[in-house]
């Protein structure tokens, strides 16, 4: 009898925990994905803060020339970063227990892998949690689809690009100036500005900003008057009210006359789908572009493609980018013994004109 009661008590405790995890009445929804998300994001955040403040220099290039990224080694908020793991580690999984000592783990940039892997698992779980909450509330699943764009971008720079280049030392550093350094080196090595997928991403981000500003200003300019001149117009809206808070016909008429009729949406649902889809698709393409350039399928090369009648080069924007890229690549590779091959290449001397006969 006692055993039966203990089993029922244990079962009821587990059932109560399951109900709490999946309850939509909590102030913050946890969900089963949240059970994974919370510890991984906490681990990533704690390790990032400690490493950003106090991590010792990291031998990022694997040539015994450590690079300092933390605040106590002289950096500030702009220049500081969690430096990627060493090129000597490559793509090896490098948890603390794989190092001979904690000092070795820090010297080889172990905190970077800890932060990035926990962060990626955390944002994947956050995306799953968005779907899970939508499912519980009977909503459509497009919120997590929209969130997949920044998730894809993070996966591209932290996971796919290092895989393609053969080392986590090529991943994006976790800092402001480190991000800009990553962008400059990426342009130098892959000519990303001449890649059509990057162009689509620029159109997605800038276009999304433009459309967001246009939509917000149109709605704000066509609000239905509910207040006096001495009151804030925001008091004219009550949360959950059934009436439209702005006149979509007036907004449609204004914009249709400003541009042309069919440039303006007359359907609120299709309008908001467009506002969501435009930047999401653009960022998807950028992530796809970074993922393909990770394997050196680079941007278009139009260098020295225009010549005059006497065969002299007429420099174009492509040539300007190419010269800038060469300069950035020289600055990136600071050591003569690690000089960029496309800059150090000279005319080769053949060792043998034909293969020797065998036998």
Swiss-Prot record:
Cellular compartments annotated: Cellular thylakoid membrane
GO MF annotation terms: chlorophyll binding; electron transporter, transferring electrons within the cyclic electron transport pathway of photosynthesis activity; iron ion binding; oxidoreductase activity, acting on diphenols and related substances as donors, oxygen as acceptor; oxygen evolving activity
Recorded superkingdom: Bacteria
This protein's name: Photosystem II protein D1 1
Miscellaneous: Cyanobacteria usually contain more than 2 copies of the psbA gene.
Keywords for the protein's UniProt record, in alphabetical order: Calcium, Chlorophyll, Chromophore, Electron transport, Herbicide resistance, Iron, Magnesium, Manganese, Membrane, Metal-binding, Oxidoreductase, Photosynthesis, Photosystem II, Thylakoid, Transmembrane, Transmembrane helix, Transport
Species for this entry: Parasynechococcus marenigrum (strain WH8102)
Gene name tied to this protein: psbA1
Post-translational modification as stated in the protein's UniProt record: Tyr-161 forms a radical intermediate that is referred to as redox-active TyrZ, YZ or Y-Z. C-terminally processed by CtpA; processing is essential to allow assembly of the oxygen-evolving complex and thus photosynthetic growth.
Annotated positions binding chlorophyll a ChlzD1: 118
Binding residue positions for [CaMn4O5] cluster: 170, 189, 332-333, 342, 344
Gene3D superfamilies: Photosystem II protein D1-like (1.20.85.10)
Keyword Transmembrane: yes
Residue numbers binding Fe cation: 215, 272
Record Pfam families: Photo_RC
Function of the molecule: Photosystem II (PSII) is a light-driven water:plastoquinone oxidoreductase that uses light energy to abstract electrons from H(2)O, generating O(2) and a proton gradient subsequently used for ATP formation. It consists of a core antenna complex that captures photons, and an electron transfer chain that converts photonic excitation into a charge separation. The D1/D2 (PsbA/PsbD) reaction center heterodimer binds P680, the primary electron donor of PSII as well as several subsequent electron acceptors.
Record-marked site positions (Stabilizes free radical intermediate): 190
Transmembrane spans: 29-46, 118-133, 142-156, 197-218, 274-288
């Amino acid at each position: 009898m006692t055993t039966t009661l203990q089993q029922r008590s244990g079962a009821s405790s587990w059932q109560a925990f399951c109900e709490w995890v999946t309850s939509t009445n909590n102030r913050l929804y946890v969900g089963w994905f949240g059970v994974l998300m919370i510890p991984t994001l906490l681990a990533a955040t704690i390790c990032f803060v400690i490493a950003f403040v106090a991590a010792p220099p990291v031998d990022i290039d694997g040539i015994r020339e450590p690079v300092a990224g933390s605040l106590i080694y002289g950096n500030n908020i702009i220049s500081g970063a969690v430096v990627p793991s060493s090129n000597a580690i490559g793509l090896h999984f490098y948890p603390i227990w794989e190092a001979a000592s904690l000092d070795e783990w820090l010297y080889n940039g172990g905190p970077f892998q800890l932060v990035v892997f926990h962060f990626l698992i955390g944002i994947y779980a956050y995306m799953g949690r968005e779907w899970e909450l939508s499912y519980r509330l009977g909503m459509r699943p497009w919120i997590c689809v929209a969130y997949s764009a920044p998730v894809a971008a993070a996966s591209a720079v932290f996971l796919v690009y290092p895989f393609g280049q053969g080392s986590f030392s090529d991943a994006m550093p976790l800092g402001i100036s480190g991000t800009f350094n990553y962008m400059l080196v990426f342009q130098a090595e892959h000519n990303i500005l001449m890649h059509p997928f990057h162009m689509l991403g620029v159109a997605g981000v800038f276009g999304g900003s433009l459309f967001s500003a246009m939509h917000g200003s149109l709605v704000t300019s066509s609000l239905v008057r509910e207040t006096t001149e001495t009151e804030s117009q925001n008091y004219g809206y009550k949360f959950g009210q059934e009436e439209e808070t702005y006149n979509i016909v007036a907004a449609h008429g204004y914009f249709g006359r400003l541009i042309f009729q069919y440039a303006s949406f007359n359907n609120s649902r299709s309008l908001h789908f467009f506002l969501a889809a435009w930047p999401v698709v653009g960022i998807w393409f950028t992530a796809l572009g970074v993922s393909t350039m990770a394997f050196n399928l680079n941007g278009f090369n139009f260098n020295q493609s225009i010549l005059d009648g006497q065969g002299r080069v007429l420099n174009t924007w492509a040539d300007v980018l190419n010269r800038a890229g060469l300069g950035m690549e020289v600055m990136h590779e600071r050591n003569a013994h690690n000089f960029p091959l496309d800059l150090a290449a000279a005319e080769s001397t053949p060792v043998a004109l034909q293969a020797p006969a065998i036998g």
